[in-house]
Regions:
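Accessory terminal helices/loops
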Residues: 2, 129, 220-225, 232-292
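Pre-active-site segment of Zn-dependent metallo-hydrolases
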Residues: 27-43, 52-83
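Metallo-beta-lactamase
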Residues: 3-7, 116-243, 251, ...
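Active-site metal-binding motif and surrounding structural segment of the metallo-beta-lactamase
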Residues: 65-111
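Active-site neighborhood of phospho(di)ester-bond hydrolases with catalytic His/Asp-centered motifs
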Residues: 58-60, 82-90, 110-113, 186-189, ...
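Zn-dependent metallo-beta-lactamase
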Residues: 1-53
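Divalent metal-coordination and catalytic microenvironments
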Residues: 49, 59, 74, 88, ...
Length: 292
């Protein structure tokens, strides 16, 4: 009797992922947190989701050097990069697109329409000249590329759906995460932070509430792994960071209501969170913005 051989389809092959976290890098600024001599930019993560052959990269980095290192990392995976997905419009998550597409010319960069609008704003001459280039002199790529607009909220990867979930205001407007239901993964962008001080400089009491609602929405997906856009290198990607991020926002909102100065807000949050990464960057910028 002849044996029956079953051939696995691409859809039968589970997806996997890997995360690259770039170390924090120094900035150039005179607006320093108390007791510090240098403001650092927080570590940033980029996630490669892959199947048997193809891969999707979620978010890139800021500087030329970071982009080249990220491209080398993707190339070392041996996967065919088809797509770069951008979770939100902050420059530190998309300035490296051009370098990646130079290395992987058959790939395309995509984002939701509202994210594309913010990307254009971040890459405008005014914002580059007033914010990014002074912080990172001679380090920002000369050529910045804007993602194409996604026409639907699903990216196909070897028969698996990568689902865009729009979560509204988190550390900026119109943010998204990427949900991979087949493996219980959420790539959260900056909607969740992993043991790094949150960037709340664009927040007020109303939008801090919106960020908490965004975290509730992510939690409702019941993920088994949540990758933060800014995470302590070496940390795992436990879903517990959803509640940790939510509690940090609650604490910041409460302390913002009981302090009158940036220094007071900064000091009190540092008492509550003495060990989180980069208080002199993200926390100080947040305190200065909320208590000008």
């Amino acid at each position: 009797m002849a044996s029956k051989t079953e051939v696995a389809t691409e859809r039968d092959i589970a997806l996997n992922w890997d995360v690259f976290v770039t170390a924090g890098i120094p900035t150039v600024t005179s607006d320093l947190a108390p007791g510090t001599k240098q403001m650092m930019w927080s570590p940033i993560s980029s996630t490669l989701i892959f199947g048997k052959r193809d891969a999707v990269l979620v978010d890139t980095f800021i500087t030329v050097e970071q982009a080249d290192i990220l491209a080398d990392w993707v190339a070392a995976s041996g996967k065919n990069l088809t797509t770069i997905y951008v979770t939100h419009g902050h420059g530190d998550h998309f300035f490296g697109i051009a370098a990646l597409l130079d290395r992987f010319p058959n790939a395309r960069a995509v984002a939701m329409p509202d994210v594309v609008k913010l990307m254009r704003q971040q890459a405008s001459p005014d914002v580059l000249a007033s914010f990014w280039k002074p912080l990172f002199p001679d380090q920002i790529p000369d050529r910045l590329m804007i993602a194409e607009e996604l026409k639907r909220n699903v990216i196909d990867l070897e028969g698996h759906d990568l689902v865009v979930v729009e979560v509204g205001h988190t550390d900026t407007d119109y943010t998204t995460c990427l949900h991979v239901p087949s493996v219980g993964l959420v790539v959260a962008g900056d909607a969740a932070y992993n043991d790094v001080h949150l960037y709340l400089a664009e927040s007020n009491a109303k939008t801090r509430g919106e960020w908490i609602a965004a975290l509730d929405k992510i939690e409702s997906l019941n993920p088994r792994a949540v990758i933060a856009g800014h995470k302590r290198p070496g940390n795992d990607d436990s879903p517990k960071i959803i509640e940790e991020t939510r509690q940090y926002i609650r604490d910041f909102d409460r302390v913002a209501g009981t302090t009158t100065t940036a220094r007071g807000l900064y000091d009190k949050m540092l008492e509550l969170y003495p060990d989180r990464v980069n208080p002199g960057g993200a926390l100080w910028l947040s305190a200065r913005a909320v208590k000008p």
